[in-house]
């Protein structure tokens, strides 16, 4: 006989915020089919508002369960009870929707799988976490693989240790495996599950069935998260996340309760173990979901009160603006106005050349009466590919390729930098640059990209650096175990490293006996080496002790390890393929980050599921354009800088002052160390003097960080010992700030008697013109009338103070006794 059970599903007093009116209800899935006694589904009740937005009503609606075939929780989770049918009605005010539930298979034995059922429970209970038995040494003599990445190891650890004392098959409830987890036996980890709950019953059934191992069971191939990229109307509201897993045999399962759901920004929202997300303030945050080695992510937008917002149609310059404004309209943010012409000439010149514009360049640009877009586009075309552009972007690539005399010697550093400079100057296609680096052979002096294999000398290090540099993927985390936050496995780590196992090096006999390095820590290596493919050498897997065959982690399989061209050639073809989802995307994201100060994916060299793009459609469009342009870097530079988005003002409005993710306004940035150094000397018209470099050398022209300068080091110049963008710092701390006020670099540039600034002071009698020139040199704009007035007053005051100081010194001199 069917029983009627009514549940008031207003957990923790959750209610709909005032002012929101629901006009319809929808439940996903619309019908539930449970096929065994451990089966469950997480329902998601969505309410459509009169504004067109959707809200999660799962815990707000009144829930009525008709029938005893299923059990429903107030949070919307439905579990099997016995074979039969049931119906759940969800109601809110005068709205209601019914969900039929069909239950079968509860009387038949359900084979409990160690791989598919037990391992996920152990993970969810925290047993194999890094703070518990998944730590390097385990806990209390019991160790599991971290987050269950090695089921076979875990099974043996659980069943074989100490003569299988953890199981009592005659009386499963007295198994130490269950007694410790429920707190019935002493357990430092405390209570992890409760007697009689679904997890307890499942583990108990596994013991009853004989504690079997089933490594052949299909594994998870992907997980999907619902809802995707949703908007939550108000801070304080909640959203249920639902996770479905697909297995290798095509079957699917609701794994919401077993999945790990985490917030990417705990200031915007927080996630509960049940998958319910609570919003805290207006903003955006990624939701990272992981389940049994599979990862997925989505983005939640917390809208907040946007009463009075009205979208204003804004002109667009290219597809970039179309994608940016589409997102801004969705999140109810208005873009800033365009920056002024003087702001633009300064911004684009610094970004593209690493130098500020000269006063003459500023005056010429401001005096040009043509349409602003026309002259801005023309300036971009002029700067891209210029000599200053080449030096600036050569320096960027010298960072990434680790041009460092510590590894290469002075000759090698200069040679590699010159090769990079030629590549930038000729606008070498990006895929060609990557291929030439990855396949380089011969003398490191005669073929400088071969120095890549001189800087990094082991297969594992080469693999980690290469995936980081050209794919923005951090493979180093899966060396000792499967990646804890990504899909990459330990097997893939060694299989990828195998592509570099046959890189050979031998001394270049033209430089016999000349070495670099050599210490108690590091051995000396030949100054110049010949890089070649040896045809021999393998990588040994750390866990298995066996040789790892070369294989790609996604897309395609290696046909044969000894294929024509060798392993590095095959790897280069795979990495630079237009079908490689990471190659082009990672570099356009870098370019965007360099020009905007923040990447669409940020950090700009960290692409992973838990770090989704702030605007996926924009990133896809940029990637597509880059590929279709045949990896033309200068084309992408022009496209980005000509967009209206790049030209937004730093001045915010009432609707975008709190936006940091969607490029609705420009974000002020601290200049990089080399740019700041060069800007100081260009603005003052002084000559640079860097020890070990020719007089007048730009900081951006220095071959490497081995040319020492305290100013550059204080302001975060990278040491070039890794490909990580984190080597360069752009923060503002007191020490460097004080050096801008009274440090020797600034002081010497100002005091240089031969500087253009000092000559101007000596020859220009009109103080107003002098002030105008100073503003143009340092700020790339004309001063306002008020600024001229205040500056004139300051000049007069300084002259008076100077006269007083001279007079005081003269009086003091009279008091000094004559010798």
Model-derived regions: residue spans:
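Primarily short, surface-exposed interaction patches in extracytoplasmic proteins
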Residues: 312-388, 393-692, 718, 726-727, ...
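Signal/transit-peptide handling
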Residues: 592-595, 698-704, 713, 736-751
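Catalytic and ligand-binding motifs that coordinate phosphates/metal ions
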Residues: 682-714
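Bacterial N-terminal signal peptides
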Residues: 1-8
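Sequence context surrounding c-type heme c attachment/ligation sites in exported
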Residues: 100-155, 166-174, 183-204, 213-216, ...
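Short, glycine-/polar-rich solvent-exposed loops and beta-turns at beta-strand/coil boundaries
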Residues: 136-138, 194, 218-219, 337-342, ...
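Short basic-aromatic helix/loop recognition motifs at nucleic-acid
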Residues: 165-169, 608-611
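Extracytoplasmic soluble-region selector
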Residues: 10-124, 133-140, 144-145, 152-155, ...
């Amino acid at each position: 006989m069917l029983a009627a059970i009514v549940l008031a599903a207003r957990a923790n007093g959750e209610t709909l915020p005032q002012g929101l009116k629901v006009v319809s209800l929808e439940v996903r899935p619309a019908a539930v089919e449970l096929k065994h006694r451990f089966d469950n589904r997480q329902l998601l009740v969505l309410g459509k508002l009169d504004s067109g937005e959707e809200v999660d009503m799962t815990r707000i609606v009144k829930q009525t369960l008709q029938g005893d075939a299923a059990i429903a929780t107030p949070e919307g989770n439905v579990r099997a009870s016995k074979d039969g049918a049931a119906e759940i009605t969800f109601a809110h005010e005068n709205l209601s929707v019914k969900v039929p539930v069909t239950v079968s298979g509860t009387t038949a034995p359900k084979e409990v799988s160690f791989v598919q059922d037990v391992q996920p429970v152990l993970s969810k209970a925290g047993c194999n976490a890094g703070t518990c038995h998944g730590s390097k040494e385990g806990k209390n003599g019991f160790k599991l693989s971290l987050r269950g990445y090695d089921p076979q190891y875990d099974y043996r650890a659980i069943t074989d240790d100490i003569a299988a004392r953890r199981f009592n098959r005659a009386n499963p409830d007295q198994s130490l495996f269950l007694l410790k987890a429920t707190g019935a036996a002493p357990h430092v980890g405390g209570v992890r599950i409760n007697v009689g709950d679904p997890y307890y019953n499942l583990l108990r059934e596994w013991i009853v069935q004989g504690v079997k191992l089933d490594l052949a069971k299909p594994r998870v191939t992907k997980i999907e998260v619902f809802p995707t990229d949703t908007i939550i109307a108000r801070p304080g509201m909640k959203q249920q996340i639902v996770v479905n897993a697909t297995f290798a045999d095509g079957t699917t399962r609701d794994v919401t309760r077993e999945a790990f759901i985490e917030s990417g920004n705990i200031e915007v929202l927080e996630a509960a173990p049940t998958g319910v997300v609570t919003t805290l303030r207006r903003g955006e945050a990624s939701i990272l979901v992981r389940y049994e080695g599979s990862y997925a992510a989505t983005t939640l937008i917390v809208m907040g009160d946007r009463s009075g917002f009205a979208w204003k149609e804004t002109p667009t310059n290219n597809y970039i603006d179309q994608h940016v404004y589409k997102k801004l309209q969705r999140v109810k943010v208005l873009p800033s106005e365009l920056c002024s012409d003087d702001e633009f000439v300064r911004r684009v010149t610094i970004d593209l050349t690493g130098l500020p514009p000269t006063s003459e360049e500023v005056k010429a640009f401001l005096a040009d009466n043509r349409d602003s877009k026309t002259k801005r586009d023309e300036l971009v075309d002029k700067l891209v590919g210029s000599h200053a552009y080449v030096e600036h972007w050569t320096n960027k690539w010298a960072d990434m390729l680790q041009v460092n005399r510590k590894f290469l010697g002075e000759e090698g550093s200069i040679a590699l930098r010159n090769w990079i400079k030629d590549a930038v100057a000729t606008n070498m296609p990006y895929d060609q640059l990557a291929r030439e680096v990855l396949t380089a052979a011969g003398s490191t002096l005669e073929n400088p990209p071969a120095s890549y294999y001189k800087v990094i000398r082991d297969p594992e290090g080469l693999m980690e650096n290469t995936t980081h540099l050209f794919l923005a993927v951090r493979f180093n985390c899966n060396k000792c175990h499967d990646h804890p936050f990504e899909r990459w496995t330990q097997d893939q780590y060694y299989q990828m490293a195998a592509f570099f196992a046959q890189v050979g090096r031998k001394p270049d006999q033209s430089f016999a006996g000349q070495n670099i390095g050599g210490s108690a820590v590091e051995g000396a290596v030949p100054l110049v080496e010949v890089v070649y493919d040896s045809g021999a050498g393998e990588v040994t897997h750390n866990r298995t002790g066996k040789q790892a065959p070369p294989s790609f982690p996604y897309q395609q399989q290696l046909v044969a390890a000894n294929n024509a061209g060798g392993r590095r050639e095959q790897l280069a073809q795979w990495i630079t393929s237009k079908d490689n989802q990471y190659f082009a995307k990672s570099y356009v994201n870098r370019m965007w980050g360099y020009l905007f100060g923040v990447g669409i994916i940020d950090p700009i060299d960290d692409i992973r599921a838990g770090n989704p793009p702030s605007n996926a459609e924009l990133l896809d469009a940029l990637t597509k354009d880059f590929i279709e342009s045949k990896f033309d870097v200068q084309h992408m530079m022009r496209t980005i800088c000509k967009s209206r988005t790049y030209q937004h003002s730093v001045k915010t409005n009432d609707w975008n002052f709190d936006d940091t993710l969607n490029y609705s306004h420009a974000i002020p940035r601290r200049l990089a160390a080399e740019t700041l150094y060069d800007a100081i000397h260009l603005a003052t018209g002084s000559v640079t003097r860097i020890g070990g470099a020719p007089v007048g050398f730009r900081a951006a022209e220095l071959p490497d960080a081995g040319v020492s300068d305290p100013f550059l080091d204080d302001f975060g110049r990278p040491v070039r010992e890794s490909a990580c963008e984190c080597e360069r710092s752009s923060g503002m701390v007191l020490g460097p700030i004080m050096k801008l006020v009274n440090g020797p670099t600034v002081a010497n540039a100002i005091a240089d008697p031969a500087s253009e600034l000092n000559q101007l002071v000596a020859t220009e009698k009109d103080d107003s013109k002098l002030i105008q020139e100073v503003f143009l040199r340092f700020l790339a704009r004309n001063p306002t009338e008020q600024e001229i007035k205040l500056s004139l007053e300051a000049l007069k005051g300084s002259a008076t103070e100077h006269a007083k100081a001279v007079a005081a010194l003269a009086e003091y001199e009279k008091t000094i006794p004559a010798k």
